[in-house]
């Protein structure tokens, strides 16, 4: 296995570990989630380049679109929570509240 793939998998693992450790703050969770999406995007791009198939080129672009939508929704949620509560703690959220 080439070292670039090992580095990308290590970046994904560190981002996943950060997501598990810093799950109480929304901003930290969003940053770790973006790190995971970035490492998945780079891995999919490298795989598509190695396969030399035009059908595999759409997968990284689709993943990039999903990452952009996730970032927009996450930042909107962060702004809404921080303006309402003044904090970015996830325990302030509840689906039972109106």
Curated annotation (Swiss-Prot):
GO terms for cellular component: mitochondrial inner membrane; respiratory chain complex I. It holds the Pfam family Oxidored_q2. GO terms for biological process: ATP synthesis coupled electron transport. GO terms for molecular function: NADH dehydrogenase (ubiquinone) activity. It is an enzyme of class 7 (translocase). It catalyses: a ubiquinone + NADH + 5 H(+)(in) = a ubiquinol + NAD(+) + 4 H(+)(out). InterPro entries: NADH_UbQ_OxRdtase_chain4L/K, NUOK/Mnh_C1-like. It is found in: Mitochondrion inner membrane. Its EC number is 7.1.1.2. Gene3D superfamilies: 1.10.287.3510. Core subunit of the mitochondrial membrane respiratory chain NADH dehydrogenase (Complex I) which catalyzes electron transfer from NADH through the respiratory chain, using ubiquinone as an electron acceptor. Part of the enzyme membrane arm which is embedded in the lipid bilayer and involved in proton translocation. This is NADH-ubiquinone oxidoreductase chain 4L. It comes from Colobus guereza (Mantled guereza).
